[in-house]
């Protein structure tokens, strides 16, 4: 499902991420993330490891099956973005990229304010 794909992508992009961090990124409560993670563990996509800094916490890592899925998702997202981007007239592409950059910066600023 989509949520599991988002989890796989975030774990793939940030190996060692915690359930708490995933919950914050995806804006899902920790118990919901834990349930989705448990399902991914059962399917051999993800493993939990004790944190090296604090053994009371666990970190999440992709197993080979999860890594393969992550790479496929990233590949598919790249080509989908490329396909969409190519529909934009060439002389407008730089504007679109600039607008996306500004949008991303605004999202990060709002996210930063939400964490204060």
Where are these regions (language model features)?
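Short amphipathic alpha-helical interaction/hinge segments
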Residues: 19, 74, 107-111
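Residues in the recognition helix of alpha-helical DNA-binding motifs
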Residues: 36
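Charged, amphipathic alpha-helical coiled-coil/dimerization segments
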Residues: 39-94
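C-terminal regulatory/oligomerization modules of transcriptional regulators
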Residues: 91-116
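Short, locally clustered residues in the helix-turn-helix/winged-helix DNA-binding domain
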Residues: 9-13, 74, 101
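N-terminal helix-turn-helix DNA-binding core of bacterial DNA-binding proteins
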Residues: 1-32
């Amino acid at each position: 499902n989509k949520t599991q794909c988002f989890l796989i992508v975030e774990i793939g992009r940030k190996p060692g991420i915690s359930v708490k961090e995933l919950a914050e990124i995806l804006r899902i409560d920790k118990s919901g993330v834990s349930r989705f993670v448990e399902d991914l563990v059962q399917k051999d996509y993800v493993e939990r490891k004790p944190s090296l800094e604090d053994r009371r916490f666990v970190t999440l890592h992709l197993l080979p099956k999860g890594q393969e899925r992550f790479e496929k998702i990233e590949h598919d997202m790249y080509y989908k973005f490329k396909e969409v981007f190519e529909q934009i007239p060439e002389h407008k592409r730089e504007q679109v990229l600039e607008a996306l950059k500004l949008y991303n910066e605004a999202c990060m600023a709002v996210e930063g304010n939400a964490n204060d």
